[in-house]
UniProtKB/Swiss-Prot annotation:
Catalysed reactions listed for this entry: O-phospho-L-homoserine + H2O = L-threonine + phosphate
Matches recorded under InterPro entries: Ser/Thr_deHydtase_PyrdxlP-BS, Thr_synth_N, Thr_synth_N_sf, Thr_synthase-like, Threonine_Synthase, TrpB-like_PALP, TrpB-like_PALP_sf
Family: Belongs to the threonine synthase family.
Native source organism of the sequence: Serratia marcescens
GO BP terms in the entry: threonine biosynthetic process
Function summary: Catalyzes the gamma-elimination of phosphate from L-phosphohomoserine and the beta-addition of water to produce L-threonine.
Modification N6-(pyridoxal phosphate)lysine occurs at: K107
Protein name as catalogued: Threonine synthase
EC number: 4.2.3.1
Lineage: Bacteria, Pseudomonadati, Pseudomonadota, Gammaproteobacteria, Enterobacterales
Cofactor(s), names only, from the UniProt record: pyridoxal 5'-phosphate
C-alpha cells in the first residue's frame, strides 16, 4: 500500500511507515494512492460473510501484500472481538451501536486495530504514542495499548471538560499509560500534539507516533463497521440508505465515505455536528471560518478545526463527487435534550452524540428512504447528563462500575509546549 501526504504529494510512504509516522511533513495527513473498488457481485458476497472475514478482505484491498492475509485476519480477529449490532428505533430508522467494546465507544475498533498493526510492523523498536482526546479516543487507545511491549502511551485531555466516568476509564490504568490533564480546551491539546510532531529532535528521541483518527490504520478499521451495518439491513433498506454521522474530528465520516467509495450502497451521508459547526457553515457558505470552540453536552464533538476534513475534500476531488451532495446539520444543546427525550419515548435510551445524529437524520430523511445513525458511545458514559435530561437512573455497565472506584493517576500541565516537552523527555524508558 502506498500513501501520499496531502500537503506534499511527493512524499509517499508505505502502510507500515504511515502507521509508525502518523503524520507527514508539515503535519500533512496521509491518504491512499490507490482507492480500491469492489464489483457489485463482490459487495453482495462480502455482505454475506462474517464480520472478521469481511473486514480482513476490505482491509486487504487497501493494505495489499504488506501484511499477509493470514496475519491480517489474525490481527483483525484480535481487534474486533465484539459485535456492532443494528438496533431498530422506528420502522424507517435504526442505530448502528458501536459501543459494545471494552471501553464502550466506537473508538475501540480503530484503537485496537491500530495497536495490532503497530505490533505487526514495529517489531522490537520502542514507540511512544502521543495523542489528544476529547473523551473516547483516550479510553480506546489506553486499553488497546495497555501492557503492550515496547509501547509507551501519553494521552492529553482538556482538564474538567470530559465526563468523570470517561476520565476514570483511561486515567486509572498506570503502567505504560501516562495521562495528562491540560489546562485548556481540546483544540489546545491537539495544538500541543502537533507541536511535538514538528519537533524533529523530540520525534526522533521518542519515536513519536499519533493514535488519533489521523492515523491511517484507525481510519481503515472504521470502514469495516459500515459494511457490518449494511450486512444486517434488509435488501429494501440497502437501496435507499441514508447514514447520519455525529461528527467532531470527522474521522468517522471519512471512513463512511471510503466505504461508499469501495462500492458500499449508501445513497447519501449527513454530517451532524453540535454548536461547533465549522463544516456545516462551510458547506452552506463556501467559507472556512472556524470559531472558538464551544463547550457542549456532546463534548467528544467539541472541535472547531476538524483534523480529517482535508481527507474528505481529497476523496470528493478524487471521486469527482460534489461536496454539495453531503448533508449537514448543526444541533443545539436544547434540541439535543429534546431529541434524547423523544428517543426515550420511542423506547430507545441514547446520549447526546447519537441524539444529534438522529435529529439530523429525522429532519432530512425523505419518504421511501431508510435511515441509519451511529451510536458512538454507551449512554452510561454520560451518566450524569443523561440521567438529568431523562429523569431516570442508568445502570452502570460492569466495565465502568469497576473503573469508577479507582483513583486517578493523571498529571496536570498548563497548555505550554515547553512544559509538555520537559514531561515527555523525563518519562521512564
Amino acid at each position: 500500500m502506498k500513501l501520499y501526504n496531502l500537503k506534499d504529494h511527493n512524499e509517499q510512504v508505505s502502510f507500515a511507515q504511515a502507521i509508525k509516522q502518523g503524520l507527514g511533513k508539515q503535519q500533512g495527513l496521509f491518504f491512499p494512492l490507490d482507492l480500491p473498488e469492489f464489483e457489485l457481485t463482490e459487495i453482495d458476497h462480502l455482505l454475506e460473510q462474517d464480520f472478521v472475514t469481511r473486514s480482513s478482505r476490505i482491509l486487504s484491498a487497501f493494505i495489499g501484500e504488506e501484511v499477509p492475509e493470514t496475519a491480517l485476519k489474525k490481527r483483525v480477529q484480535a481487534a474486533f472481538e465484539f459485535p456492532a449490532p443494528v438496533a431498530k428505533v422506528t420502522d424507517d430508522v435504526s442505530c448502528l451501536e458501536l459501543f459494545h467494546g471494552p471501553t464502550l465507544a466506537f473508538k475501540d475498533f480503530g484503537g485496537r486495530f491500530m495497536a495490532q498493526m503497530l505490533a505487526e510492523v514495529a517489531g522490537e523498536q520502542p514507540v511512544t504514542i502521543l495523542t489528544a482526546t476529547s473523551g473516547d479516543t483516550g479510553a480506546a487507545v489506553a486499553h488497546a495499548f495497555y501492557g503492550l511491549k515496547n509501547v509507551r502511551v501519553v494521552i492529553l485531555y482538556p482538564q474538567g471538560k470530559i465526563s468523570p466516568l470517561q476520565e476514570k476509564l483511561f486515567c486509572t490504568l498506570g503502567g505504560n499509560i501516562h495521562t495528562v490533564a491540560i489546562d485548556g480546551d481540546f483544540d489546545a491539546c491537539q495544538a500541543l500534539v502537533k507541536q511535538a510532531f514538528d519537533d524533529q529532535e523530540l520525534k526522533d528521541a521518542l519515536h513519536l507516533n499519533s493514535a488519533n483518527s489521523i492515523n491511517i490504520s484507525r481510519l481503515l478499521a472504521q470502514i469495516c463497521y459500515y459494511f457490518e451495518a449494511v450486512a444486517q439491513l434488509p435488501q429494501e433498506a440497502r437501496n435507499q440508505l441514508v447514514i447520519s454521522v455525529p461528527s467532531g474530528n470527522f474521522g468517522d465520516l471519512t471512513a463512511g465515505l471510503l466505504a461508499k467509495s469501495l462500492g458500499l450502497p449508501v445513497k447519501r451521508f449527513i454530517a451532524a455536528t453540535n454548536a461547533n459547526d465549522t463544516v456545516p457553515r462551510f458547506l452552506t457558505s463556501g467559507q472556512w471560518q472556524p470559531h472558538a470552540t464551544v463547550a457542549t453536552l456532546s463534548n467528544a464533538m467539541d472541535v472547531s478545526q476538524p483534523n480529517n476534513w482535508p481527507r474528505v475534500e481529497e476523496l470528493f476531488r478524487r471521486k469527482v463527487w460534489q461536496l454539495k451532495e453531503l448533508g449537514h446539520a448543526a444541533v443545539s444543546d436544547e434540541t439535543t435534550k429534546d431529541t434524547m427525550r423523544e428517543l426515550a419515548e420511542l423506547g430507545y435510551i441514547s446520549e447526546p452524540h447519537a441524539a444529534i445524529a438522529y435529529r439530523a437524520l429525522r429532519d432530512q430523511l425523505q419518504e421511501g428512504e431508510f435511515g441509519l445513525f451511529l451510536g458512538t458511545a454507551h449512554p452510561a458514559k454520560f451518566k450524569e447528563s443523561v440521567e438529568a435530561i431523562l429523569g431516570q437512573e442508568l445502570p452502570l455497565p460492569k466495565a465502568l462500575a469497576l473503573r469508577a472506584e479507582l483513583p486517578l493517576l493523571s498529571h496536570t500541565l498548563p497548555a505550554s509546549f515547553g512544559e509538555l516537552r520537559k514531561f515527555l523527555m523525563g518519562l521512564p524508558a
